[in-house]
Design a protein with these regions (language model features):
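Short acidic (Asp/Glu) and glycine-rich catalytic loops that position anionic groups and cofactors
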Residues: 225-230, 323, 348-354, 379-385
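Non-catalytic, well-ordered alpha-helical scaffold segments
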Residues: 139, 143, 243-247, 344, ...
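A glycine-rich, hydrophobic/aromatic-adjacent loop/helix-cap motif
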Residues: 356, 367, 376-436
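Secondary-structure capping and boundary motifs in well-ordered enzyme cores
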Residues: 216, 223, 241, 350, ...
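A charged, amphipathic alpha-helical module
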Residues: 341, 345-371, 375-378
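N-terminal export/assembly segments and adjacent metallocofactor-ligating motifs
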Residues: 1-262, 266-325, 338, 356-357, ...
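Conserved alpha/beta enzyme-core scaffolds, especially Rossmann-like or related mixed alpha/beta domains
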Residues: 125-128, 232, 332-340, 349-352, ...
Length: 436
């Protein structure tokens, strides 16, 4: 073996000489963020960073979150001394778009900005100042400043559409997700509008480990993405037709009687009664003068009578909410109206979404739609949804169709089910400082 020598060898040796090892992390717009890293320091400068792999196992039988960290974080020390790093204020000279700037002192920059803000406040009020939010977590101090000033803060999620409005509308919560290790427990994972092999580097291992655990992964994507390469199945789809696919799967499940009846009755609004004349929920104020507007009703198949749905619990104890049929109800004005469960209306709405019709829309063979629907209906299913759906026209309806698919199959509220949408982060730290 020949001896390696020269400048290159000496540079390599210097890489393995350091003064101390410190803890480091990067709190930027990736999730869960806060990867524990070791920073190797020499002469007061960071030589490099490495994954610490120091996280404990949270639950027996489930892999830990190690190692955490990616090449983006590993390259961060190079940016500290990069020649194009902006280290002082720059003021534009010339026209917008020319890319011409001149350096100015901090005093000059802060004074000019403050003067402009004061002029705007005096002339038009503080609401004339707009502070755009960014994906950078360092925006938290800017948010605090803007709130104190009375300025307008934009919705960062709306600006770059990394948000799932359909799920928000369905469940009424901003972030309806479990922790990342829950992916490991899914029997079936649908990767939809996402490419986690590239975009979720630190936590993708849970999806790979899920396969080792006996789970199955299906990537639904128009392209043969890196995440499709590592899936059990890749289902190509025509861009923008995801809602049709999800609704066709729902129709297959209902027609085959594969839906989870008790879950649908108890955990969804599909069992509540709707007036056929208005298409609105039957409400307490419809039935009795002075009753609540937020009181809804079931039709009890056991007593064959109208029954108030309890407002303090989802339990259907002693009641068998009907999912089919139409019924006559006497209103407070002594007029009778026809009502039916939401489920009955849903069944009719899905008549237009046969596998054949949806297959023509989505460019998917009908048998593939049927097979995928049966997989979802018979397994603990998690949908790994990326932010691409929020960037699609009617993306909210795509997400609501996905939520309906999970509702019919009882796939939320227990381990290994539900959706992974938007961010999965620890509810602590500067990202949530101004939201507490």
């Amino acid at each position: 073996m020949s001896r390696v020598s020269g400048d290159w060898a000496e540079a390599y040796r210097r890489k393995w000489k350091w003064d101390r090892v410190a803890w480091s992390s990067h709190n930027v717009d990736c999730y869960p963020s806060g990867c524990p890293l070791h920073a190797y320091v020499k002469d007061g400068k960071i030589l490099r960073e490495e994954q610490a792999g120091s996280l404990p196992q949270i639950e027996p039988g489930i892999p830990d979150m190690n190692p955490m960290g990616c090449q983006k974080g590993a390259s961060w020390p190079q940016l500290l001394d990069a020649p194009d790093r902006v280290t002082r204020p720059l003021r534009r000279v010339g026209e917008r778009g020319e890319g011409k700037f001149e350096p100015v002192s901090w005093d000059v920059a802060l004074t000019e900005i403050a003067d402009a803000m004061l002029d705007a406040i005096e002339e038009q009020g503080p609401e004339s100042i707009i502070v755009p939010m960014t994906p950078e977590m360092g925006a938290s101090p800017a948010r605090i400043f803007a709130n104190a000033l009375g300025a307008v803060i934009t919705d960062g999620s709306a600006e770059f559409h990394d948000f799932s409005p359909g799920f928000h509308l369905t469940w009424g919560v901003f972030n309806p997700v479990a922790s990342m290790d829950d992916w490991f427990l899914a029997d079936l994972t649908l990767i939809w509008h996402a490419n986690p092999v590239y975009t979720y580097i630190t936590m993708y291992h849970y999806l790979a480990e899920s396969r080792y655990n006996g789970g199955e992964i299906v990537t639904i994507a128009p392209d043969f993405s890196p995440s499709a390469v590592h899936a059990d199945y890749h289902q190509p789809i025509r861009i923008g037709t995801d809602a049709a696919l999800a609704l066709a799967m729902c129709k297959v499940i209902i027609d085959a009687g594969l839906y989870q009846k008790q879950f649908v009755q108890e955990q969804t609004d599909l069992s509540l009664l709707v007036r056929t004349d208005t298409g609105r929920f039957l409400r307490g104020s419809d039935v009795a003068v002075g009753d609540r507007d937020d009181q809804f009703f079931w039709w009890d198949a056991l007593t064959r009578s109208l029954t108030s749905a309890p407002r303090g619990t989802l339990a259907t104890t002693g009641v068998e909410p009907a999912l089919e049929g139409s019924y006559r109800v006497l209103l407070a004005d002594d007029n009778a109206v026809e009502v039916e469960p939401v489920f009955a209306r849903l069944r009719r709405e899905l008549d237009d979404y046969t596998p054949e019709k949806a297959g023509a829309i989505c460019e998917i063979h009908p048998d593939n739609i049927r097979a995928l629907a049966r997989k979802v209906a018979t397994r603990k299913t998690k949908i790994f949804v990326g932010c691409n759906s929020g960037k699609s026209y009617h993306g909210d309806l795509m997400e609501r169709a996905m939520a309906l698919l999970l509702a019919l199959t009882g796939n939320w509220g227990k381990k290994g089910t539900g959706v992974r949408s938007w961010a999965v982060i620890g509810l602590d730290g500067q990202a949530f400082l101004t939201q507490k």
